[in-house]
Amino acid sequence: VARAKRFLLTFLLGTLSAFGPLSMDMYLPALPDLQANLHTSQSLAQLSITACLLGLAIGQVFVGPISDRFGRRWPLLIGVGFYALTSFVIVGVTQISTLIVLRFIQGLGGSAGQVLSRSIARDQFSGKSLARFMAILMSINGVFPIIAPLFGGLVIRFTNWQGIFMILGIIGVILVLCVLFFLKETLPKAKRSRSTGHAFKEMGELVLDGGFMKYALGQGFVMGALFVYIAGSSFVFQQIYHLSPQMFSFIYAINGISLVLGSNIVGRLVTNLSEERILRVGILFGVSVTGLLSLSLILGTNMYVLMIGLLLMVFGIGIVNTTATSLAMNAEGDKAGGASALLGLSMNAIGGLATPLVGLFGSHSQVPMVLLMFTAEVIGFLIYTGFTKRLA
């Protein structure tokens, strides 16, 4: 029974943490269709991704401290319910401006799933057991980038981009029911913040904590590289290389497997190696891969070199995401909601600001996308190493 309960908790938290991938990856094969249907530009279509990412980021700033004060369960129910409702409303949208606003609101609701899945995990685990649980959680999270674009490509084949939001709404309703009937409160009243104001104050203290921020900002920029890839890959493979939505979805799914492998390997390595060392290697690996890929594309290579480079980059991101999250949450166990909120804010805000740059720097070449990924990886590396040396 205990094993079954743990499996259910793991799967539920993994799905809740995947609101970002669910909201982006299922939607990616539909971007060209959406652009044509709403008579808009590539950059405005990509802005709908940015809006959702910013909603995910800003929402976490409020949900995290509120959950430290009032517990995890009710903020989670309200947020996921709001996500489901907004998804259904988006189905009737006819203008890109309305879609962008609603995507922001959808992100606000989905932020509860992202921030509270990490907080609930920290309520239940600590130390290396948290690292192992996070590796499992991130592996489940990573399954969605595999399934979602394939499913999205299939939906586009039979319906249109609105059908994807109908499905997202249904998923939201199912998760509300799962939380309502299967998830108990994990933060006892004795461990909650004295007031909401005190919870926000604690989050402010985290911003000034270099030991925490080196993980939050370092991870944020590395994940920024992933969001640049998410925003640009649909147009690169479908419009530059003229692949079908289904073939693009297949390539994207293969990279999703690479993300799962990167996350999963951490759970095995952490038994013999320190998490700090694993994180350092993961960041350096990402910088090296994107640097070499940028150079090769500038010199002129084919689609297969790009595919291999992206596969390796995403593997490194899986390593960084898992270890940085575990290290940051371990360091701030008594402020789990605020710590999780800042991690989410960093990832989604940086990703949200980076994604429109892909369209602005040109949609007729893959080079801007890869150079932006390399830049994000380098900044993440510099922030992590800079903070580490300062704190030594």
Protein language model annotation of sequence segments:
Residues 102-143:
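Cytoplasmic helix-loop-helix junction between adjacent transmembrane helices
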Residues 2, 186-216:
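Juxtamembrane intracellular "pre-TM" segments in multi-pass secondary transporters
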Residues 60-71, 262-276:
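Helix-to-loop junctions at the C-terminal end of transmembrane segments
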Residues 82-89, 97-105, 304-312:
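Paired small-residue
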Residues 98, 135-181, 250:
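Helix-loop-helix hairpin linking two adjacent transmembrane segments in secondary transporters
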Residues 277-323:
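C-terminal transmembrane helical hairpin of 12-TM major facilitator-type secondary transporters
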Residues 58-97:
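Conserved MFS/SLC helix-loop-helix module at the cytosolic interface between two early adjacent transmembrane helices
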Residues 37-39, 71, 92-98, 109, ...:
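Helix-breaking motifs and short loop linkers at transmembrane-helix boundaries and internal kinks
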